């Protein structure tokens, strides 16, 4: 099908007049580099055991509570209960052991309005995961990790999947994040810091270290690298976010500079802090806080959050 001539005029005029809508942020420094946008295919890269999934869960939780986005998650290496345990702890801002049974059950019911999980007891083909995403009706999908799928392990096979995933987001409007691992070369001696305070520690993988080749980076919209110095006595509590690709900077986001990642402080496991800002803080439940909506009925904070969650940010 050929597109009509002139059908891009309104977009061009909006660009000229500064009316292009920005991607969704978290109201912290991370927004300068990373924005959520609909209809995108995004890649996440990082070494094993640096906390990629943990950071992704925090990021998704914050987007859900702030913007009402809904997520469909396939996590081949983590159980649903483990993910929800971490999310509830972040949401409450308290360690899980300090929560009552009633708090846990209430928070579970609330958060499951935003998060749907795909059964990981089955080995899925890529097209089966995409079908589950569509069935969920969610705004966002996560494949974690790509290497856990029943797939053709070849460069051509990776391109075929990325092309199908690209067509899926274009037609469906969903945004998909794909969590990936780097190749073996990225973990060898040549990728260690050679001097200074970080001597001997493993560097973050380069964009082109992604296992399976450049088919992923060539076909994705945005790409970020998650890294952590897991053996450093101080830096092991800091997660680095390096934004390596932003396809459309007009709608927000930009590359992080070399050696200047966005630093996310672990914050004792109750939700990351970035430059002293805890993006989850405004959305944590406060049983004493009540609000009066326009119709004069009393509305608890939790009810207000549920109401806001049903509003479409786009």
Label for each model-derived stretch:
Residues 82-90, 161-164, 215-219, 242:
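Alpha-helical scaffold elements adjacent to nucleotide-binding pockets in ATP/GTP-utilizing enzyme cores
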Residues 1-17, 130-141, 170-172, 185-314:
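C-terminal regions of RecA-like/P-loop NTPase motor modules
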Residues 42-44, 72-74, 118, 177, ...:
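Hydrophobic/aromatic beta-strand patches that form the interior of the parallel beta-sheet core
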Residues 76, 181, 228:
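Cofactor-binding loop segments of dinucleotide-utilizing enzymes, especially the Rossmann-like FAD-
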Residues 67-160, 291-292, 299-305, 314:
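Conserved inter-motif catalytic segment of the P-loop NTP-binding fold
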Residues 73, 142-143, 174-181:
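Structural recognition of the conserved hydrophobic beta-strand(s) that form the central parallel beta-sheet
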Residues 35-36, 65-67, 107-110, 131-136, ...:
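Conserved catalytic network of the ASCE P-loop NTPase/AAA+ motor domain
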Residues 1-93, 314:
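The Walker A/P-loop phosphate-binding site
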């Amino acid at each position: 099908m050929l597109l009509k001539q002139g059908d891009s005029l309104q977009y061009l005029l909006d660009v000229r007049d500064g009316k292009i809508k920005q991607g969704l942020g978290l109201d912290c420094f991370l927004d300068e580099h990373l924005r959520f946008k609909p209809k995108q295919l995004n890649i996440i890269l990082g070494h094993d055991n640096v906390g990629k999934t943990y950071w992704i869960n925090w990021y998704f939780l914050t987007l859900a509570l702030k913007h009402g986005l809904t997520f469909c998650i396939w996590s081949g290496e983590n159980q649903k209960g483990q993910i929800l345990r971490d999310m509830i702890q972040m949401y409450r801002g308290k360690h899980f052991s300090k929560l009552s049974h009633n708090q846990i059950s209430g928070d579970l019911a609330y958060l499951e309005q935003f998060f749907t999980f795909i059964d990981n007891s089955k080995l899925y083909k890529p097209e089966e995961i995409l079908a589950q995403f569509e069935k969920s009706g969610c705004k966002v999908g996560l494949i974690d990790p790509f290497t856990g799928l029943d797939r053709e392990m070849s460069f051509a096979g990776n391109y075929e999947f990325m092309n199908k995933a690209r067509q899926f987001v274009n037609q469906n409007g969903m945004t998909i994040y794909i969590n990936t691992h780097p190749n073996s070369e990225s973990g060898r001696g040549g990728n260690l810091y050679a001097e200074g305070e970080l001597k001997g520690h493993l560097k973050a993988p380069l964009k082109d270290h992604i296992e399976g080749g450049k088919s992923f980076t060539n076909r994705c919209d945005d790409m970020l690298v998650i890294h952590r110095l897991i053996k450093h006595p101080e830096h092991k509590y800091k997660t680095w976010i390096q934004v390596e690709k932003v396809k459309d900077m007009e709608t927000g986001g930009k590359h992080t500079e070399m050696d200047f990642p966005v630093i996310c402080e672990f914050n004792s496991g109750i939700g990351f802090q970035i430059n002293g800002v805890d993006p989850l803080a405004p959305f944590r439940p406060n049983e004493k806080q009540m609000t009066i909506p326009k119709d004069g009925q009393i509305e608890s904070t939790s009810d207000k959050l549920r109401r806001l969650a049903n509003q479409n940010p786009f």
